[in-house]
Amino acid sequence: RFWFFIFDRFILYPLMNQLSQTFGTKFMNLGYWPTKESATDEQMRALVERQDLHSLNDVKVKYTNIFTNSDLDRPHYFLYERALKLHSHYPDLEGLRILDVGCGQGEGIKWTKKVHPRIGSIHGVDRCAAPNPDIIPGDAHHLPYRSRQIDIVLNVESSHLYADCEQFFRECSRVLRKDGYLCWTDLLYRSQVAQIREQALRAGLFEEHWEDITDNILAGIERTAARYDSLLMKAPSIVRLFSSSLRATYCAPGTHTHARISRGEKGYYAAVWRNN
């Protein structure tokens, strides 16, 4: 985990910040794609697909011939919606205060504001945050919020990098109001699943739903990895020096990280916990 942080903090994040102005690459999650088997995704699919995705592209994307603009980040939007849809008040989420822990560059915050305009507020916390008025630099183990302030803690594909997940769960329980929710998705070794669920329970979080969404993530990776592979081919030489590490980070087919998912060593899960 230490080396993951070093790579993210000093190599991957600076590269993403530099390249986002050229490529429009702001998300760092693997992506999610509804399949025929995921029939309960219809509400979420309709919500995403009716958005004018062009309006979210606040940077000029140089290589527009790779995909249409409306497809660029759709798998990433789907993953955010997949986490939020576990909440009982989805999709309105009216008046609720949301904290996105591990929010990266804040594109998920921007998306959530657009498609859920009736929320009370949304802010982010990230240890490697770029300058953004909606994001507070902070550590998931010590959230910079007072107790009982938040209705929803949103945690998308971030907790596997934490040194102490149980401490993160305790912090969620602290900042969440009574009956507030932690909406969570992440990639885990299957051998870790029982431990993670037990840690959340010990922290005072009651599990209301747990689901394996690995097939949808693999379908998402097919789309996101194809896009990023195309961008890497056209990237500056200094970026291509890190191609192997970058491809492993976004789990491109043919990498060891993708193989761990496809052969079942790792799974991808969505869960919602209620704060007691």
Role assignments for model-derived ranges:
Residues 152-164:
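A short SAM/SAH-binding and catalytic strip from SAM-dependent methyltransferases
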Residues 1-42:
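N-terminal auxiliary segments of SAM/dcSAM-dependent transferases
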Residues 73-94:
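Conserved alpha-helix/loop element of class I SAM-dependent methyltransferases that forms part
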Residues 166-178:
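A short glycine-rich, Lys/Arg-flanked "PGG" loop and its adjoining helix->strand segment in the class I
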Residues 215-274:
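Conserved Class I S-adenosyl-L-methionine
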Residues 99-142:
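Class I SAM-dependent methyltransferase SAM/SAH-binding core
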Residues 141-153:
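A short acidic, Gly/Pro-enriched loop at the edge of an enzyme's catalytic core
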